[in-house]
Amino acid sequence: VTSGVSLGHFTLAPAPASAWANTLSSATTPARVAQPVPVTTQPNVPYAQMPNGIDIASWQHPNGADVDFKRVQKAGYAYVFVKATEGTHYKNEYYVNDAMAAQGNGVLMGGYHYADVSTDAAAQARMFADVIKVKGGASLPPVLDIEEAKGLTAAQLNKWVRTFLQETYNRIGRKPIIYSYRSFLMNQMGNTSDFTSFPLWIADYNGKQSPTLPLPGGWKTWTFWQYSSQTRIDGIQAQNVDTNKFGGTMQQLRAFAATGVVSASKK
């Protein structure tokens, strides 16, 4: 890669030659990942056909209990996002085991970082990248979970997010997913459209079969939708688990895991 990657209203510099991207297959190199193709996920893909998934953290391990991903997969959940890190101080002790167990049982897996915008973004991205470089790596792109402003202005928040996304890309060679909720994107982040070419994972517990439209921040479509935080899942001892929909078919989800791009569905 010899030139920067244009994403939204700012440009990611090319990942260094030594980045972890070089250990990935050619399908996940930055040149391929950086060409998102918008896709209308509804009504082309009926709600019932959108793959279900979960996201978990240490809370889903009460008293150190393991997650039985074989049962999770049989219950109809095709993917999981596992919390890896938070700020510069926390690493999820269950991350590696969860990542390996999920992929060993046919569940697509990605890691997420919970942002602490009161501390350095680049340092957080570096720690996050180090943690998620487990054996085999993650099948889904990395995720930035941004949901606390901690007194920062919209401009300061957006700068923080840019820095984190750039450093994560430098370290991993994959364009991150952005997770947040509607009011945070609209209010704390000023409804910025700077990040619209990054995949959106939106939290919206509206009880419907689609997130509230129009989406915040100028996004034309969503990639993942967290629609509940209170689901009981076979194989997980915790009472409540976050559940999600992927905005496409299972075939598109597998392709997204390989490329970071949601391709248009064939009619």
Where are these regions (language model features)?
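Secretory targeting and sorting signals
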Residues: 1-9
